[in-house]
C-alpha cells in the first residue's frame, strides 16, 4: 500500500494525508519529503513529479548523502562523484520545484576519521557555496553511534575528527 513504484497516486495520497495531519496540529511546521540516494536525480524526479502530478504538498526536500552507500549501490564510483552529483541534484531540484532543500542524513566511516573530516568539510562547503544557498543545512545521522554502526562519528565514546568539520564550518582546516 502506498508504494510509489506500484501506485504513485496512493503514495501521493499518503504523503498528502501526512502533510495535512501535521499542518492541522502545527500549521507552521515544515514538512520534509526525504529520500535516500541524494546523488540520484532520476529517483528524485520520479518521486517529486509523481507527487506534483497528484497534487501532494511538501515544504522542503530532504536528501541523504552517504558516499559509502552510494558507492555500494553503484550510484557512484567515488566520493568525489557522490559529492558532485548530490550538489548538481540539489541545484536541479531547486530549479525544478523552487523548494528549499536540506541534507537530512549523511555519515562517514568512523574508522577513517581524517578522510571523514575532509569529506564533511567539502560537503559543507559545497552545500554552502555551490548549491546557491538553497541547501538550508546538514544533519549527520547518529554521530554518537559506534560499534555496530560504522557510519557514526564517535569512537570510545568520544567524537572523532569527523565532527571537527562541523565545528570549523567546512573551512578545510587541517
Language model regions located:
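Short, surface-exposed recognition loops or helix-turn segments adjacent to catalytic cores
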Residues: 27-36, 169
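Glycoside hydrolase catalytic-domain groove-lining segments
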Residues: 9, 13, 17-20, 24-31, ...
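Short, well-ordered beta-to-alpha junction loops that form the rim of enzyme active sites
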Residues: 35-37, 106, 143
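Active-site mouth of glycoside hydrolases
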Residues: 1-6, 35-39
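Aromatic-rich peripheral "rim/lid" segments of glycoside hydrolase catalytic domains that contact
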Residues: 3, 7, 21, 78, ...
Amino acid at each position: 500500500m502506498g508504494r510509489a513504484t506500484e501506485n504513485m497516486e496512493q503514495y501521493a495520497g499518503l504523503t498528502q494525508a501526512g502533510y495535512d495531519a501535521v499542518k492541522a496540529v502545527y500549521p507552521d511546521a515544515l514538512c520534509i519529503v526525504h529520500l535516500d540516494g541524494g546523488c540520484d536525480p532520476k529517483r528524485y524526479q520520479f518521486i517529486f513529479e509523481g507527487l506534483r502530478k497528484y497534487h501532494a504538498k511538501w515544504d522542503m526536500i530532504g536528501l541523504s548523502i552517504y558516499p559509502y552507500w552510494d558507492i555500494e549501490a553503484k550510484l557512484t564510483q567515488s566520493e568525489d562523484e557522490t559529492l558532485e552529483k548530490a550538489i548538481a541534484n540539489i541545484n536541479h531540484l531547486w530549479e525544478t520545484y523552487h523548494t528549499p532543500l536540506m541534507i537530512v542524513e549523511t555519515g562517514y566511516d568512523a574508522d577513517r576519521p581524517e578522510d571523514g573530516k575532509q569529506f564533511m568539510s567539502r560537503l559543507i562547503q559545497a552545500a554552502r557555496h555551490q548549491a546557491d544557498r538553497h541547501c538550508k543545512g546538514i544533519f549527520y545521522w547518529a554521530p554518537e553511534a559506534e560499534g555496530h554502526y560504522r557510519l557514526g562519528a564517535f569512537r570510545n565514546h568520544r567524537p572523532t575528527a569527523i565532527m571537527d568539520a562541523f565545528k570549523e564550518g567546512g573551512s578545510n582546516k587541517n
